[in-house]
Amino acid sequence: MKKLISVILFFSFTVFSQTAENEDVNDKNIEEVVVKGNVLYSDQVNALKTPVPILDVPQTVSIVTDVDIRKQGFREIGDIIRYTPGVNTSQGEGHRDSVVFRGVRSTADFFQDGVRDDVQYYRSLYNVEQVEILRGPNALLFGRGGTGGIINRVTKKAVVGETFTAHDVGIDSFGAADIALDTNFQLENGAALRINLHSDSLANHRDHYDGNRVGFNPTMTLKVSPETTVFLSYEYADHERFIDRGIPTINGSPDESLSDIVFGNSSANVQTLEATIMRAQVEHTLSDTSKANFSFTSSSFDKLYQNIYASGYDGTLVTMDGYYDPTERDNTIMSANLVNELSLGGVVHTLLIGAEFIQTDNENLRYDANWSTTNDDNEIFNITRPMDFTVNSGGVATALDYVTKLNRQTASDISVTSIFIQDQIDLSDNWKLMVGGRLDDFDITVDDIKNDTSESRNDNTFSPRAGVIYKPQENVSLYLSYSESFLPRSGEQLSLIHIWRCRRAI
């Protein structure tokens, strides 16, 4: 892979005022100031909802900041995964993020600002403050799924009291290019507006491969009072790309002699996404040791992927299969939590209490590819570069359509209500204990439109969590942890018709 040649233009403008007179500080006695309280604003992992330092968390966590993203030239989640231990990236059929957490593959365990983001697509990084990768199950904080871990993207928010602008421009030797803008404006009455936008074009060494992505994300921060801050965000995404499913395998390994052949074409292999995400968050400080948080998210996704791919190969001929698969999903998610630090009997407790409600409407259908010569989704072709899918291996003209063979069509309605509580107890400077649990009421109805049937299921699931941390010194921690997660048998994308009892992971 050729290296990315990146040109970065950065402009920063800062407006500030200073009222202190010019004095020689060397002639003054400097008074030592000790600040107490406000511990809720210490460095923390956003997804964990509490201000506990990373070393005091009984879970493996990795953080990649926006500075790391820019320095390394990361453009997608998969780029970050390749640099992170304990997780791997997989192909994702050429149209979605697909992560393997400790051997468990997932295309749905993604979060944005701690809110579920489980539609299958390639997520952009232009508006990301940091990416948090947590390994191991933890349904207490994240609910269903996450059997191997989760990835949380923390988005950039408008900054009150600052004015700055940054530009990124990049181009590589294949012709791929990207441009991004990040600008922050100080408004009146304790408010700020920040605009992030990007546009990129995709290209690499493979035939047919191209695509475009556009993202626009204005955010506003309103300092309503010294204790209350409101964050507002609107995000729009418009993606289109060629789907490359790779090359056939022989004896369990890719046939490298085919590495310069694309088994697809630009008309049959395409993915599109149009999404709007609106978020509102209110943070209210009750005291130096207590804070409440409420968030509301409304999102709408319209996703399509269609493709043909090599489903069989004997060394000389290739069998092609394919399908057309659109999804429409609307989410409404509300969550609230209270974080309180208190001392009981000389022992410090960090208490988290919260609740979450999720309403999801999902519509999905799939048409199998249909070749006119076989009236089936499989057809055999000679291997050429480029591949010719208009004539089969017998020399007979054939045509492909995606409107003849309906495989499935479902409409799903999902409601999830959750409550959770967690207590981290500082027994001493060396020993810490974490205990808690979450109760989820998961209700799903799947209508099988193709066969005119319907199935429903309700699961009430309790997920415990416990951990012990030992710190032999300040910068070292050893932990023993037990946690559970569950995955309803509705499939990651909520479209399965046969709904069985949910599975659990420990």
Where are the regions a protein language model picked out?
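Outer-membrane beta-barrel translocator/receptor signature
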Residues: 126-129, 140-218, 224-228, 276
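Acidic/polar loop-and-plug regions of large Gram-negative outer-membrane beta-barrel proteins
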Residues: 200-204, 216-285, 298-329, 375-408, ...
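Structural signature of Gram-negative outer-membrane beta-barrels, strongest in the C-terminal barrel
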Residues: 223-225, 329, 348-350, 356-360, ...
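Transmembrane beta-strands of outer-membrane beta-barrel pores
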Residues: 169-175, 199-203, 214, 236-240, ...
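Acidic, small-polar-rich N-terminal luminal/periplasmic segments of exported/outer-membrane proteins
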Residues: 28-162, 485
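Repeated loop/turn-to-beta-strand initiation elements of outer-membrane beta-barrel proteins
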Residues: 190-193, 227-230, 289-292, 346, ...
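Membrane-embedded beta-strand positions of outer-membrane beta-barrel proteins
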Residues: 165-169, 195-197, 232, 294-296, ...
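Hydrophobic, lipid-facing positions within transmembrane beta-strands of outer-membrane proteins
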Residues: 97-99, 149, 163-167, 177-181, ...
